[in-house]
Regions:
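C-terminal motif of bacterial Sec signal peptides marking the signal peptidase cleavage site
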Residues: 16-19
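Interaction-mediating elements
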Residues: 3-4, 21-211
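Sec-dependent signal peptide recognition
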Residues: 3-13
Length: 211
């Protein structure tokens, strides 16, 4: 028990020391990106809600990696002397990670990308906004909030064939189709449906066709 208490105490002391060292290394006027928070639209039913993980893929800036709750990689990067070329400093540069400073242009682009993604999922006129909180220690937390638009749903599915020989091949496999009436008009699902039909036709010996 004493060992773990001392170990945890050392970790906390190291974390405080690392944090102070990093703060002094951050240039004036810049903020270290500490965290991205994503707030999905909880007014949407869970089975149709676009999740934080999905939204997070469209956030362009990600904070530095952490180790045992500390900015170890960032501290290692800052502690390397750029004017000295030796194995110790080279090792620090390889292990370390360059700081990710808040770039509001990238933040705006992230919000725009999130909106485009939600629209492509069938939730047209969606909204994506963000807010930035900064601290006296020159850290920044970016919070992205989303509002999914009213979903457009598939009312009817029709197939039109220029080549009548294709009809039985495609219609025979409609049970495996990803498209269902009543589902949200998700363009990512439409693309998967096109790919599925293309693969099926090629496997049947057809190569010159358009979908």
């Amino acid at each position: 028990m004493k060992f773990w208490s001392r170990f945890i105490g050392l970790i906390l002391i190291a974390a405080m020391a690392v944090g102070c060292g990093i703060t002094h290394s951050i240039p004036q006027g810049k903020y270290l990106l500490q965290k991205n928070e994503i707030k999905p639209d909880e007014s949407v039913p869970r089975d149709e809600r676009i999740t934080a993980d999905e939204i997070g893929r469209y956030v362009r800036q990600q904070p530095n990696k952490r180790f045992l709750g500390t900015n170890f990689y960032l501290w290692t990067y800052f502690s390397a002397n750029p004017d000295k070329q030796n194995w110790w400093n080279n090792l620090k540069r390889r292990i370390g990670e360059a700081p990710v400073y808040l770039d509001t242009l990238q933040t705006e682009r992230s919000a725009s990308n999130i909106k485009i993604y939600m629209d492509s999922r069938g939730y047209f006129n969606s909204e994506a906004s963000y807010s930035i909180d900064t601290t006296s220690r020159r850290r920044a937390i970016v919070t992205y909030r989303t509002k999914q638009g009213r979903p457009y749903r598939i009312g009817e599915i029709r197939y039109r064939f220029r080549d009548r020989f294709l009809a039985p091949i495609i219609l025979e496999d409609t049970a495996a189709s990803l498209l269902r009436t009543g589902n949200v008009l998700d363009f990512t699902v439409l693309d998967k449906g096109r790919s599925r039909i293309s693969t099926m036709l090629r496997n049947s010996g057809y190569f010159n066709f358009t979908i």
